[in-house]
Amino acid sequence: MAAAAAEQQQQGFRPLDEASLVAYIKATPALAARLGGRLDALTIKEVGDGNLNFVYIVLSDAGSLVIKQALPYIRLVGDSWPMSRERAYFEASALQKHRALCPDHVPEVYHFDRAMSLIGMRYIEPPHIILRKGLVAGVEYPLLAEHMADYMAKTLFFTSLLYNSTTDHKKGVAQYCDNVEMSRLTEQVVFSDPYRVAKYNRCTSPFLDNDAAAVREDAELKLEIAELKSMFIERAQAFLHGDLHTSSIMVTPDSTQVIDPEFAFYGPMGYDIGAFLGNLILAYFSQDGHADQANDRKAYKKWILKTIEDSWNFFHKKFVELWNKHKDGNGEAYLPPIYNSSELLSLVQKKYMTSLFHDSLGFGSAKMIRRIVGIAHVEDFESIEDASKRASCERRALNCAKAILKGRRQFESIEQVIVHVQSFDRD
């Protein structure tokens, strides 16, 4: 431990606490300027409720910002699980890249210090809250589906071979290959550990012990998850956020901001889309655990289902519109001299989007399963105090996810998926 700490100091890294953070800000003009230069009465709050990092909100009477520092281990576990600090570089660059493509929904980066693994960025001010917390509280966000569809369509289309030359695409892939440690973490916790006995797996025991064992013994499920894992590892389709769940999104009724892309890499588009949709389905199944006499949550559950439906349909529409607009550009996936009629292009688009839809359903289901029988669970369920009630909600979600994952190619529309989800919403 001491040797590791000494090596980090030689590299210019030191974990900041509130006192040393103030000194760091004073010595960094790009950050001091955001606080109006008034640095003698700062309010600092550590809010890192994630699994990996320290996150500080810094307020002065003239400005605000957020400081995020990556630690050399997984915060959720401790220094027994080391983790590269370079993830901060990939997060900062991903925020900058995605903001250039979708400025309405990605916060600005003010400062990045690679040696310190530190990002200074916009403080996404109240009344913004983490979307997952809003879903637990039963808050409706009327623009969420359209905003997320816009974000996903732009970030995925403009970083794919539908828009870019092979040369430019390969350069992007090469830049983010070094974020392999984060991708390997995903491989382990999403595609491997839930399907075997693993040290950090947990479930709502004893209620779900048999359910977790059934996942580990399900041969058909393992065949399907192996296919998804291969796609995740091998298919550099577009530049992904890499962790696009409902705790990576901050919202108000009229604003949506996507944060925390430290898992960013080039991978299958369906992984981002599925992460978002799968977490909405988890939120749906959790609602009965949050219902009370004042609010049975039935109307809210309908809103969640409508949001899932709209998110895919808006995304499909926006993505194909971008494709049509740029079909004669530099993209090398479908060269205009070959796909030279509207009829042929329409056939290509239908096949492409159907495949993407099925990928999204598969990855979304995998993300649901890992949140119930794997390492990192979600507040949607964890905040249900009655363990028996929590397990009942989780079991419905788990059974739904397994069925969608196995049968994803049978679905022809998101509306069919919604009907399928509802069929599992009973004991």
From Swiss-Prot:
Q: Which residues bind substrate?
A: N51, D243, R370
Q: Does the keyword ATP-binding apply?
A: yes
Name the pathway it acts in. Answer: Amino-acid biosynthesis; L-methionine biosynthesis via salvage pathway; S-methyl-5-thio-alpha-D-ribose 1-phosphate from S-methyl-5'-thioadenosine (hydrolase route): step 2/2
Q: Which UniProt keywords apply?
A: Amino-acid biosynthesis, ATP-binding, Kinase, Methionine biosynthesis, Nucleotide-binding, Transferase
Task: List residues binding ATP.
Answer: D49, G50, N51, L52, N53, K68, R122, Y123, I124, D260, P261, E262
Q: Which domain of life is it from?
A: Eukaryota
Reactions mediated catalytically: 5-(methylsulfanyl)-D-ribose + ATP = 5-(methylsulfanyl)-alpha-D-ribose 1-phosphate + ADP + H(+)
Identify a single GO molecular function assigned to this protein: S-methyl-5-thioribose kinase activity
Question: What class does this enzyme belong to in the EC scheme?
Answer: transferase
> GO:BP terms for this protein?
L-methionine salvage from methylthioadenosine
UniProt-listed Enzyme Commission number(s): 2.7.1.100
On assembly, the entry states: Homodimer.
Q: What does this protein do?
A: Catalyzes the phosphorylation of methylthioribose into methylthioribose-1-phosphate.
Q: Which family does it belong to?
A: Belongs to the methylthioribose kinase family.
Name assigned to this protein: Methylthioribose kinase 2
